[in-house]
UniProtKB/Swiss-Prot annotation:
UniProt keyword annotations, A-Z: Ribonucleoprotein, Ribosomal protein, RNA-binding, rRNA-binding
Domain of life: Bacteria
Record protein name field: Small ribosomal subunit protein uS15
Lineage: Bacteria, Bacillati, Bacillota, Bacilli, Bacillales
Function: One of the primary rRNA binding proteins, it binds directly to 16S rRNA where it helps nucleate assembly of the platform of the 30S subunit by binding and bridging several RNA helices of the 16S rRNA. Forms an intersubunit bridge (bridge B4) with the 23S rRNA of the 50S subunit in the ribosome.
Similarity comment text for this entry: Belongs to the universal ribosomal protein uS15 family.
Subunit structure of this chain's protein: Part of the 30S ribosomal subunit. Forms a bridge to the 50S subunit in the 70S ribosome, contacting the 23S rRNA.
GO BP terms: translation
Keyword rRNA-binding among UniProt keywords: yes
InterPro entries linked: Ribosomal_uS15 (IPR000589), Ribosomal_uS15_bac-type (IPR005290), uS15_NS1_RNA-bd_sf (IPR009068)
Gene that encodes it: rpsO
NCBIfam families to which the protein is assigned, alphabetical: S15_bact
Length: 89
């Protein structure tokens, strides 16, 4: 269900704003999107796993708040990010 540390490091390198960046909204949104995708695959197979479903909903909400923040601060970075991640908004 969770993404591997190696995959997380790849996402951080791809979406970071500067060399030591790990906490920018872009990085957080990219990592959350990967975790949401992995959890979605798990829930397709395990339909009655309501505990994981609640975790998924919390992650989606956290990502939504980060996307709203990024959109309010820098609309261009927001548009580039949702296009590269393939998020419908």
């Amino acid at each position: 269900m969770a993404i591997s540390q190696q995959r997380k490091d790849e996402l951080i390198k791809e979406y970071r704003v500067h060399e030591t960046d790990t906490g920018s909204p872009e990085v957080q949104i990219a990592v959350l999107t990967a975790e949401i995708t992995a959890l979605n695959e798990h829930l397709r197979e395990h339909k009655k796993d309501h505990h994981s479903r609640r975790g998924l909903l919390k992650m989606v909400g956290r990502r939504r708040h980060l996307l709203n923040y990024l959109r309010s601060k820098d609309i261009q970075r927001y548009r580039e990010l949702i296009k590269s991640l393939g998020i419908r908004r």
